[in-house]
Structures are given as structure tokens and as C-alpha cells.
Amino acid sequence: MKLLITGGCGFLGSNLASFALSQGIDLIVFDNLSRKGATDNLHWLSSLGNFEFVHGDIRNKNDVTRLITKYMPDSCFHLAGQVAMTTSIDNPCMDFEINVGGTLNLLEAVRQYNSNCNIIYSSTNKVYGDLEQYKYNETETRYTCVDKPNGYDESTQLDFHSPYGCSKGAADQYMLDYARIFGLNTVVFRHSSMYGGRQFATYDQGWVGWFCQKAVEIKNGINKPFTISGNGKQVRDVLHAEDMISLYFTALANVSKIRGNAFNIGGTIVNSLSLLELFKLLEDYCNIDMRFTNLPVRESDQRVFVADIKKITNAIDWSPKVSAKDGVQKMYDWTSSI
């Protein structure tokens, strides 16, 4: 099999690429190396085996068309994208060009030149908006959604908020419509929070990794307070990279069953954490005290998002295996090693 990964030097892309190399898959990695850690991930991948690296920009139609026509991949994990809510607000045009324009470039190249190529697209829970139409309770450490105690499924109303939600939502819908109208083999994963090794987190993207960085700093004697947005009771279900690898490659083996569908993806309610609960895990594991100052709530932030994954579980018999506690410890250990 010939596999293309756009954004293949990012966190998720590099994890998927490393597994592909371990399986002897013919791999093409496409990336513009603009994100923090991307060059480091490329060097790491290069130490694992041989693959084709293409330095290009998903916004450039010619780059994408040449990519598809030259390599004619059997399958593609489309991960290239602008991934930060805050960046989308600072620069909505760039956010649109990458997430919508870039996705259309890929879809059109596949439609015109390689229509049998399978595409699995990494979308987001932000397509559901701020979810303020639901009722919430507040405990000492977290918010809980009264109306959706087991999480949100795919029947949840689409409600794009923020430029990021709009751009990812538009790409999400183009993926589904190209399956419906043009018969392409596309699949959409609406992700909650992902974390794991090779995640060079930043303040506005990759919250588990970011706060693991803070824990490492505190453990090393850097005790200045850090900031969080809101009161720390916001909840997400977290999914470790090992489970992401299992998901994507299991899905790839079952594309005929799931093409043209969107799936909510996450660690489920049993692997859900608030910021405060994450801090407690890190404090206990590292024997530290995590002190922070509060900033205002971020625009369009969800108080709770937990994925109900019954649809994908029923379709391909996949579910998470790495617990939040074990995964956070793995994340901390990797962060402290770099």
C-alpha cells in the first residue's frame, strides 16, 4: 500500500508515519514544516526508515496536484491544517486558506486524477459550537453536562463558532459531500483532545502536552505561576497517540464500511479530565504543586466536550485502551525526556 500523510511531521502525522514505517508501508510525507517541532519530527522519522518527504504547502494547488499525480497514493490521512482557535481569530484569512482551500485542493486533485484514493480527514469537535444550549452542573473540580451524561454523538447539531470552527466545519462538510456527489472514499473524524509523544505543544494548542511542560518546569525548579483560561473546570475526553494509531489504521482497513460518514472520536467519559483534574494527576505523579493564575474564558470555549463513540465502535470494533492516568504519565515522561 502507498500511503500519503499531509501534515505528516506534526504530532498526529508523525505518530501515524512511524507506525506506517514499522509496517513496511510505502510512505509519502507532505509538510511545510511551519509548526513548532515539525523539523524535529522529520529528523526523528528519518531515523526510523526510508520514505518520500515532499516539502510543500497545502494552500498551493500546484504543489498538491503534483503530489497526487506523481505518487498516486492508495490512501491519504489528511492532517495538514491550521489547528489553533486563537490563531484563527488573529488571522481568519490564513485559517480559511489552509483549512478550506487546502482541503479543496486535495479533494479536487484526488477527484480529477486518483479517484480511488481513500481519504481520512482529521476534523474537530469545534464543528458543534460552544454547546451552550445544554444544561450543566458544576462540581468542585469539573463541569458536567446534565443533558448528555455519556457524551455527544453525531446527531449533535452542527453550529460553527469562531473562524476555526467555520473553516474546519466547511472542510468537514466538503469531505462528506465529495463522497456523496463524486463517489470519493472519504471519512471524517471529529476529534476531541489528542495527546502523546512527538507533541510539541504550545499555549494555544495541545493542552495536555502544554501543562505537562509546565509540570516539568516546576519539577526542575522553575516555579513561576502559569496561566489558564477560565476556572479550570472545562472538561475534555483525552485520547492517547497509541489509540489514535489503532483508530486510523483500523479505519483504513475498513473504508468500504465507513466511507461518506463522520464519527465523533475521543477517549469517552471514562477518560475525561478537567484542567484541575489534570493538575492533580501531575501533582501526584511528580510530587509538585502547580500554581496558576486565571485569565478570562476563551471565546467559544466549550465547558464540556466528551465524545460518544458508539458509531465508530459499532462500525469497526475500535475503542480506546490507554487510560487517562497512564497516558498522562506517558506524556509527562516523554516531555521530560526531550
From Swiss-Prot:
Disulfide pairs here are none
Q: How is the cofactor bound?
A: Binds 1 NAD(+) per subunit.
Q: Which domain of life is it from?
A: Bacteria
Q: Name one GO biological process term.
A: lipopolysaccharide biosynthetic process
Sorted alphabetically, the keyword list is: Isomerase, Lipopolysaccharide biosynthesis
Record-listed E.C. numbers: 5.1.3.10
Q: Which organism is it from?
A: Salmonella typhi
* Annotated GO MF terms: CDP-abequose epimerase activity
Cofactor(s) listed in the protein's UniProt record: NAD(+)
Q: Report what the protein is called.
A: CDP-paratose 2-epimerase
Write out the residues that bind substrate.
T124
What is the catalytic activity of this protein?
A: CDP-alpha-D-paratose = CDP-3,6-dideoxy-alpha-D-mannose
Q: What does this protein do?
A: Catalyzes the isomeration of CDP-paratose to CDP-tyvelose.
Tell me which InterPro entries the record gives.
NAD(P)-bd_dom (IPR016040), NAD(P)-bd_dom_sf (IPR036291)
Metabolic or biological pathway: Nucleotide-sugar biosynthesis; CDP-3,6-dideoxy-D-mannose biosynthesis; CDP-3,6-dideoxy-D-mannose from CTP and alpha-D-glucose 1-phosphate: step 5/5
Entry's family note: Belongs to the NAD(P)-dependent epimerase/dehydratase family.
Cited Pfam families: GDP_Man_Dehyd
